[in-house]
Amino acid sequence: MEFVDEKRYRKIKNGVGRAVADFNLIEEGDRIAVAVSGGKDSYTLLHILEALRRRAPVKYDLVAFTIDSGYPGFRSDVIAAHLKEHGFSHHVEATTHYDIIKEKRRPGSSYCSICARLKRGVLYTLAQQHGCNKLALGHHLDDFVETLLLNQFFVGTLKAMAPRMLADNGATTVIRPLVYVEEREIIPFARENSFPVVCCCCPVCGKADIQRKRMKELLKELERENPAVKRSLLRALANVQPRHLLDRELQRVCEVP
C-alpha cells in the first residue's frame, strides 16, 4: 500500500521498528495473529507490520482476525473487503458475546471490560488454531499512560501494560508494537489513507469508560504545561527505582546483598 504522507508514515514505522528492537517483539519464523477490530489503531498496526515485513531481516507471517461480538449493525464485511483488497489473510469469528454481556453485566457497569476479556479469550484460541505463536494488539502510547494513571488513581496499583508478555494460556505471546506511537499520529494517518473505520456498534459506545476519558482530559491539561508529559510517563515505566517504593516484597529483594 502506498501511504499518502510519507513523513508521517515513516515516523510511525520507525516508532514500531524501535519497539520491535527494544522488546524483541518479532523473531524469525513468527506467525503473528493481528487483532483487527475495524478501528484506526488496528488498521494502522496491521499495515505498518506488513510494511516492515517486506523489508525485515527476519521472516514472519501475519494473519488478521476480527471478532464479531454480535452487536446489531457491526459491519465485518467492510473490514473483510479492505483486507482482501490489500492481500491480507483474514478470518472473521462470529460470537454471541453480546447476549452473554447482557446477561452477566452488573447494572451501571461498562460493557468494555467484559467484552475485552471475552474477545481476548477467543483471540488466544484462534491464534492457537491457526498456528500463530504471537498475538499483536493495537494499544498505543496513550493507552499505556492512561492505564498507568487509571490503576494509580482508581485501583491503587503501580501497573500499566507490557509491550510483550506471555498470555495466561502459556502458549501465546502478546505484543503491542504501537507502544511508542501517540494517538495523535494515528488519527490523521488513518484518515488520510482512507482506512474504512467501523464502529463496534456497542449500545453504549462513546458513553462508557468515563474514568478513561477523565485521564485523557487530565493528560491534555498537563500537556499545556509540559508537551512531553506522556512520553515522560512512558519512560517512567522503564525506569523503576524499587528501593524508593513501598512494596514490601520489592524492599526485601533490594535488601538482599
From Swiss-Prot:
Molecular function in Gene Ontology: 4 iron, 4 sulfur cluster binding; ATP binding; metal ion binding; transferase activity; tRNA binding
BP terms from Gene Ontology: tRNA modification
Keyword presence, Electron transport: no
Annotated localization: Cytoplasm
Catalysis performed (reactions): cytidine(32) in tRNA + S-sulfanyl-L-cysteinyl-[cysteine desulfurase] + AH2 + ATP = 2-thiocytidine(32) in tRNA + L-cysteinyl-[cysteine desulfurase] + A + AMP + diphosphate + H(+)
Cofactor note: Binds 1 [4Fe-4S] cluster per subunit. The cluster is chelated by three Cys residues, the fourth Fe has a free coordination site that may bind a sulfur atom transferred from the persulfide of IscS.
EC number: 2.8.1.-
Pathway(s) this gene product operates in, as recorded in its UniProt entry: tRNA modification
InterPro entries on file: Rossmann-like_a/b/a_fold, TilS/TtcA_N, tRNA_Cyd_32_2_STrfase, tRNA_thiolation_TtcA_Ctu1
Domain of life per record: Bacteria
Residue numbers covered by motif PP-loop motif: 37-42
SUPFAM superfamilies per the UniProt record, alphabetical: Adenine nucleotide alpha hydrolases-like
Main EC class the enzyme belongs to: transferase
Gene3D superfamilies the record matches: HUPs
Cofactor requirements of the protein: Mg(2+); [4Fe-4S] cluster
Protein residues bound to [4Fe-4S] cluster: 112, 115, 202
UniProtKB keywords: 4Fe-4S, ATP-binding, Cytoplasm, Iron, Iron-sulfur, Magnesium, Metal-binding, Nucleotide-binding, RNA-binding, Transferase, tRNA processing, tRNA-binding
GO cellular component, one term: cytoplasm
Note: The thiolation reaction likely consists of two steps: a first activation step by ATP to form an adenylated intermediate of the target base of tRNA, and a second nucleophilic substitution step of the sulfur (S) atom supplied by the hydrosulfide attached to the Fe-S cluster.
Family, per entry: Belongs to the TtcA family.
Function field: Catalyzes the ATP-dependent 2-thiolation of cytidine in position 32 of tRNA, to form 2-thiocytidine (s(2)C32). The sulfur atoms are provided by the cysteine/cysteine desulfurase (IscS) system.
Assembly and oligomerization: Homodimer.
HAMAP family, A to Z: TtcA
Protein name (database record): tRNA-cytidine(32) 2-sulfurtransferase
